[in-house]
C-alpha cells in the first residue's frame, strides 16, 4: 500500500507532520546494517517460532498466570515489518505473510484473537496483548501490496475491535471501564490500545473506531488520575505520577500522538511534548534509557551514578526501544532535531549494547527455570550503568508448554533497528532530512515526486567526518537538512569546498543541486567528561505493592560515593570500562579532565581490546598513565563477571 494515501494508517500525517518516513530505497554498509542482518538471521526468519507464537492464541495459556504471551506475536511482527521496509528481504516477507495468515485463522467466532478465554478475558495483560495483535497486523498491511490479502487482514481487525466495542465503554451504558480491565498499573497497559484503534480508524474511515478512541482518551489512561491531564498541566515529573511504569506510560502517549493527528486538539500535542521534555530532563541516562528501578520512571537522570540501587535490573530494553519509537514520532510531527539527538544516544549505546552479538545465554534465567531449553536470544533485557554485568535476567520471561520460552524485551528488540532505518533519512515539504550518518546510499523521494540519492561515505560514529555526494536528475531547488548533534560544539560544513554556516539543530542547505555536488561535514568529537548531578535525597514512586495494584512513595538518598564517578562521551558514543581490558572496573581511577571539560584521549591505530569493539581509546589519568576503554555497546558481551563493565567509572 502507498504509505500516505487515503485509507492508510499514515494518511492523517499529511496534515500534521513536518517530516515523512517514506522509504524509497536505502542500503547501508556499517554497524546498523550488520546488526539488522544478525537480528533477521537469529530471530525474524524463524518460522517455527512464529508458529509457536500463534499457537498461544489457540491454547489460551495466559489464563493460568494472567500473562502476556499474547504480546509476543504482534511485538515481533511490528519490528519485523520495520526491518522489511528497509531490507526488502523476500524470504522474511514470506515468513511474515504466512504467520499473519495463520493468526487470522486463529480468530474465534466472536472475532477475538486472545490468549485468554471468554470466561477469563479482560484481565492481566489481555488488552495489552490484543493491542499488539492489532499493531502487528496494521504494520504488515503497510508492507504488503496484496490488496485482497490486506482486505482480509483489515476485516479481521475490524471484527476484533467490534467485539471490544461491544463490551468496553461507559459504565452508564452497561459496559466495562477500560482502566479497570487489568490488575496492573491502574489501567495504563490496557489504555495503550489507543494507538491501533486510531490507526484502524484511518485504515477504514469508520467513525465507530474514532468514537472508541475518544472514549479511551476521555478515561485518561489510569483509573486514579488522568495521565494526559497531568502532562498537560506540567506541574510534576512523570516519576512523581501515581503510576510510573515507563514502557506502558510512553506507549499511551504514542497513542495520544496518533490521536492528535486525527482530532488536532493542540492541548493533546502540548501534553505529549511536555511529557517528552520531562522525560528528557529527568529520566534519561547517558546510555539513552530510563529507569534505575527496573522499568519505572524514577528520576534516573540524577540517580544513574548511584552504585548501590539494590537491584541490577535497570535500563530495560523495552523502555529503550519504546522511547526510540516515541522520539522518532516526535521528530516527524515537530521537526525538532533534539528528539533525534536522544534517539541517537539510545541507538548507539543502550540499544546496540543489548544486541547479543556473542550468543551469550542468560544464566540467571537458567537457574530460575532449570526445566527450560536455554538458547542464546538476540537481545538482553537490562543494561548496567555503574560497575555490573549484562545478562541480569530475561525481562518478561514466559515459558511455553514445549519447554521453550520468550520474553518481552526479546520481542521488541527488532523494532529498534527497524525504526533506526526509518529515522535515518526523511522527506520534508521542502526537501530531504539526514538524521543519522551511516555509510551507504539513500534514495529519498521529494514531495514533487522526484528522487534524490545521497551517497554517504563515513566511519561514523567512530570518526567525525561525513561525506555526502548528491545524485539527482531533479532540476528544481530543494533543501537538504543535516542534523547537527547537540554534542558537536564546532561543526564544520563545506559544499563543494565552500564553507556554510552550521547552526545548532538542523543545518539547512537550500539550492539547486547538481549530480556530483559534495557536502563535507566534520563533527566536533572531542571526548568530554560528564559528572553526576547532586540531589541529596528525594521522594520517589518506585515501590510496587503487588496484588493490590498500588504504588507507594519511597525515600531515596544519594549514595555517599555517587559523586566519585565520571562518564566519558565521544561523539554519540559512551565509553565503557571492562574487566578484560587489563584492570578491574571496581578499582578507582583518576581521570585527567582539562579545564574546559574535555579529555585528551588517545585513539590507537590498532585496537588491542580482546573482544570485537567499534571504538577503542586510551584515557589519561592524573598520574600520567592511561587505561583502555571501548564503546559501551561493545563491552560486557559475555554476560559474566569476566566482562564486568561500567559506563560510570569509579574515581579516586
Protein language model regions, located:
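Short linear capping/connector segments at secondary-structure termini
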Residues: 114-122, 177-181, 232-237, 294-299
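Helix-terminus loop motifs that line ligand-binding clefts
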Residues: 48, 76, 90-127, 283-294, ...
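C-terminal beta-rich recognition modules with glycine/proline-rich loops and embedded aromatic residues
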Residues: 213, 272, 340-463, 502, ...
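Aromatic (Trp/Tyr) and acidic
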Residues: 2-90, 123-147, 187-203, 207, ...
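Alpha-helical junction/boundary sensor with strong preference for TPR arrays
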Residues: 87, 107, 144, 164, ...
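Accessory beta-strand-rich segments of carbohydrate-active enzymes
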Residues: 481-507, 512, 521-524, 528
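Asp-box/WD-like beta-propeller blade repeats and closely related beta-sheet repeat scaffolds
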Residues: 118-127, 134, 150-188
Amino acid at each position: 500500500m502507498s504509505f500516505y494515501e487515503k485509507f492508510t494508517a499514515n494518511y492523517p500525517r499529511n496534515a500534521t507532520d513536518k517530516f515523512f518516513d517514506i522509504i524509497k530505497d536505502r542500503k547501508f554498509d556499517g554497524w546498523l546494517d550488520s546488526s539488522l542482518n544478525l537480528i533477521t538471521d537469529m530471530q525474524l526468519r524463524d518460522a517455527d517460532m512464529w508458529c509457536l507464537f500463534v499457537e498461544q492464541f489457540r491454547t489460551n495459556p495466559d489464563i493460568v498466570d494472567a500473562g502476556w504471551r499474547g504480546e509476543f506475536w504482534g511485538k515481533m511482527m511490528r519490528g519485523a515489518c520495520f526491518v522489511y521496509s528497509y531490507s526488502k528481504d523476500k524470504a522474511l516477507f514470506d515468513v511474515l505473510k504466512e504467520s499473519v495468515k495463520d493468526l487470522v485463522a486463529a480468530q474465534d467466532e466472536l472475532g477475538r484473537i486472545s490468549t485468554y478465554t471468554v470466561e477469563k478475558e479482560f484481565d492481566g495483560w489481555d488488552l495489552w496483548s490484543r493491542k499488539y495483535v492489532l499493531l502487528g497486523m496494521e504494520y504488515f498491511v503497510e508492507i504488503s501490496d496484496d490488496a485482497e490479502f490486506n482486505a482480509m487482514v483489515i476485516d479481521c481487525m475490524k471484527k476484533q475491535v467490534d467485539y471490544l466495542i461491544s463490551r468496553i465503554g461507559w459504565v452508564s451504558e452497561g459496559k466495562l471501564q477500560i482502566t479497570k480491565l487489568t490488575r496492573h498499573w491502574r489501567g495504563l497497559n490496557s489504555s495503550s490500545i489507543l494507538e491501533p484503534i486510531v490507526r484502524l480508524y484511518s485504515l477504514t474511515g469508520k467513525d465507530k473506531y474514532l468514537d472508541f478512541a475518544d472514549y479511551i482518551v476521555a478515561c485518561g489512561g489510569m483509573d486514579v488520575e488522568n495521565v494526559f491531564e497531568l502532562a498537560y498541566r506540567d506541574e510534576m515529573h512523570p516519576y512523581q505520577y501515581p503510576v510510573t511504569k515507563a514502557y506502558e506510560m510512553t506507549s499511551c502517549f504514542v497513542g495520544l500522538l496518533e490521536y492528535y493527528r486525527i482530532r488536532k486538539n493542540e492541548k493533546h500535542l502540548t501534553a505529549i511534548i511536555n511529557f517528552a521534555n520531562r522525560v528528557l530532563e529527568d529520566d534519561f541516562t547517558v546510555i539513552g534509557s530510563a529507569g534505575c528501578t527496573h522499568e519505572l520512571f524514577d528520576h534516573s537522570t540524577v540517580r544513574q551514578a548511584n552504585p548501590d540501587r539494590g537491584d541490577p535490573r535497570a535500563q530495560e530494553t523495552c523502555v529503550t526501544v519504546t522511547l526510540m519509537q516515541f522520539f522518532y514520532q516526535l521528530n516527524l510531527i515537530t521537526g525538532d532535531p533534539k528528539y533525534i539527538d536522544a534517539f541517537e544516544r539510545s541507538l548507539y549505546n543502550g540499544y546496540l549494547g543489548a544486541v547479543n552479538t556473542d550468543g551469550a545465554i542468560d544464566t540467571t534465567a537458567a537457574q530460575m527455570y532449570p526445566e527450560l531449553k536455554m538458547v542464546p536470544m538476540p537481545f538482553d533485557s537490562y543494561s548496567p550503568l555503574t560497575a555490573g554485568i549484562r545478562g541480569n535476567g530475561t525481562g518478561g520471561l514466559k515459558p511455553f508448554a514445549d519447554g521453550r520460552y520468550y520474553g518481552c524485551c526479546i520481542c521488541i528488540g527488532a523494532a529498534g533497528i527497524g525504526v533506526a532505518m526509518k529515522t535515518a533519512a526523511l522527506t520534508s515539504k521542502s526537501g530531504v532530512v539526514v538524521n543519522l550518518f551511516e555509510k551507504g546510499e539513500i534514495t529519498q523521494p521529494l514531495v514533487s515526486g522526484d528522487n534524490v540519492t545521497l551517497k554517504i561515505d563515513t566511519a561514523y560514529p567512530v570518526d567525525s567526518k561525513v561525506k555526502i555526494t548528491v545524485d539527482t536528475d531533479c532540476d528544481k531547488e530543494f533543501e537538504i537538512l543535516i542534523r547537527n548533534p547537540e554534542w558537536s560544539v564546532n561543526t564544520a560544513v563545506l559544499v563543494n569546498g565552500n564553507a556554510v554556516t552550521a547552526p545548532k539543530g538542523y543545518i539547512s542547505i537550500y539550492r539547486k543541486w547538481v549530480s556530483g555536488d559534495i557536502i563535507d561535514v566534520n563533527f566536533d568529537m572531542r571526548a568530554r567528561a560528564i559528572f553526576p548531578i547532586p540531589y541529596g535525597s528525594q521522594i520517589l514512586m518506585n515501590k510496587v505493592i503487588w496484588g493490590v495494584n498500588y504504588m507507594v512513595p519511597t525515600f531515596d538518598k544519594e549514595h555517599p560515593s555517587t559523586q566519585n564517578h565520571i562518564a566519558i562521551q565521544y561523539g554519540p558514543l559512551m565509553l565503557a570500562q571492562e574487566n578484560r581490558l587489563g584492570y578491574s572496573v571496581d578499582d578507582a581511577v583518576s581521570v585527567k579532565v582539562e579545564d574546559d571539560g574535555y579529555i585528551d584521549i588517545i585513539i590507537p591505530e590498532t585496537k588491542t581490546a580482546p573482544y570485537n569493539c567499534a571504538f577503542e581509546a586510551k584515557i589519561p589519568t592524573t598520574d600520567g598513565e592511561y587505561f583502555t576503554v571501548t564503546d559501551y555497546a561493545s563491552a560486557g558481551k559475555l554476560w559474566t563477571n569476566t566482562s564486568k563493565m561500567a559506563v560510570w567509572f569509579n574515581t579516586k
